Structure formats: C-alpha cells, structure tokens
C-alpha cells in the first residue's frame, strides 16, 4: 500500500504541475484504503486497490475545502494512476 501511495502521489503532483494547478492548492495527495475493487486490465477483470485523490485549499490550515479541478486534470490523473501504478483498479476524487 505504501508503494502505491507514493507512486500515485507522485503522479498527482506531476499532473498538477503540468496543468498549472500545483501552486494554486494547499495540499494534494493520494490515499490508499483497505478495500479492493474489480476493474479491467487488458481484456480481463482484475481485483485491485482503490486510490482516492485529495486536493484541498486552505487559508490558515484550520479548515479546508476541496479544489474544483477541471475534469481534464482529474481524467489525466486517473488515467495515469490506473495505467502506471501496479495493483490499482479504481481512482476516486474526494469531495470534502
């Protein structure tokens, strides 16, 4: 799970930098829970981890609101994580 979290968080950061959103958010990272989900790998079903992406903005770190990222950015993050991180079948975005 730690490997998945590190790899997915790296992709989140890379995609936020590529899209110009990196300096506009307070925190952005991946979370890997214990649940598994069925996805498709190639032409076969595959059981794998669910990665949740959290991207938030905050002024004083007392409260945080989710960032309304453009769909294209979310799609790029999701596609890269499911294609590049071994063992991941689903990517979700957390709306606080």
Q: Where do the PLM segments sit?
A:
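ATP/NTP-dependent adenylation/nucleotidyl-transfer catalytic domains that generate, transfer
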Residues: 1-96
């Amino acid at each position: 799970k730690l490997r998945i979290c590190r790899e997915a968080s790296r992709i989140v950061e890379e995609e936020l930098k590529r899209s110009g959103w990196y300096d506009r958010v307070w925190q952005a990272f991946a979370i890997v829970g214990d649940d598994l989900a069925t996805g498709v790998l190639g032409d076969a079903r595959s059981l794998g981890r669910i990665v949740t992406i959290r991207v938030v903005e905050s002024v004083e770190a007392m409260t945080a609101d989710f960032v309304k990222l453009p769909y294209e950015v979310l799609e790029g993050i999701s596609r890269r994580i499911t294609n590049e991180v071994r063992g991941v079948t689903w990517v979700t975005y957390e709306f606080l």
